[in-house]
């Protein structure tokens, strides 16, 4: 098996995914780790995802737009505020891909105006779509 992907800081690429549906998280984790050889941390709790982001450096975030207690946009805004202070060695702030349902597609145009938002994907997800979005969002070395 090849070595894990690395970014420009020569750190292993790592993605944090948070969504209330554990089936969605399993599909994301298995697709990315098996097909792209990128480490993925997952949590159905946005509060725990926040704690993980404080502890580790990530290359990309995938957040559910409609999360209980702390929605994906608010979670990302909170991380934008503190991430550079707790990870000063990082050369850039991770982008985000939001995951929504069909009824949330209206929000996607407004959300995509932020340059840090790499994509807004609608469920149900497919393996091909997940892999394509990740490849378009971060620099992935082709083997």
Predicted feature locations:
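Two-component/phosphorelay signaling modules centered on CheY-like receiver
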Residues: 22-41, 48
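Alpha4 helix (beta4-alpha4-beta5 surface) of REC/receiver domains from two-component response regulators
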Residues: 74, 100-120, 132
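Non-catalytic signal-transmission and effector/linker regions of two-component phosphorelay proteins
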Residues: 1-30, 77, 82, 86-93, ...
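Acidic, metal-coordinating helix/loop segments flanking the phosphotransfer/catalytic sites
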Residues: 44-60
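Acidic catalytic/metal-coordinating carboxylates
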Residues: 45, 71-77
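Active-site residues of response regulator receiver
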Residues: 64-66
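A short, hydrophobic beta-strand element within the central beta-sheet of small alpha/beta folds
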Residues: 86-106
């Amino acid at each position: 098996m090849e070595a894990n992907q690395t970014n420009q800081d020569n750190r292993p690429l790592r993605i944090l995914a948070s969504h209330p549906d554990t089936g969605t998280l399993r599909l994301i984790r298995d697709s990315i780790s098996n097909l792209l050889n990128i480490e993925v941390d997952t949590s159905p709790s946005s509060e725990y995802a926040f704690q993980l982001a404080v502890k580790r450096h990530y290359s990309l975030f995938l957040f559910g737009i409609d999360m209980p207690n702390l929605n994906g946009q608010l979670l990302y805004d909170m991380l934008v505020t503190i991430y550079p202070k707790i990870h000063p060695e990082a050369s850039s702030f991770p982008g985000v891909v939001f995951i929504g349902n069909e009824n949330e597609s209206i929000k996607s145009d407004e959300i995509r105006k932020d340059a840090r938002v790499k994509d807004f994907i609608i469920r149900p997800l497919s393996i091909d779509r997940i892999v394509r979005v990740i490849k378009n969002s971060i620099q992935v070395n082709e083997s």
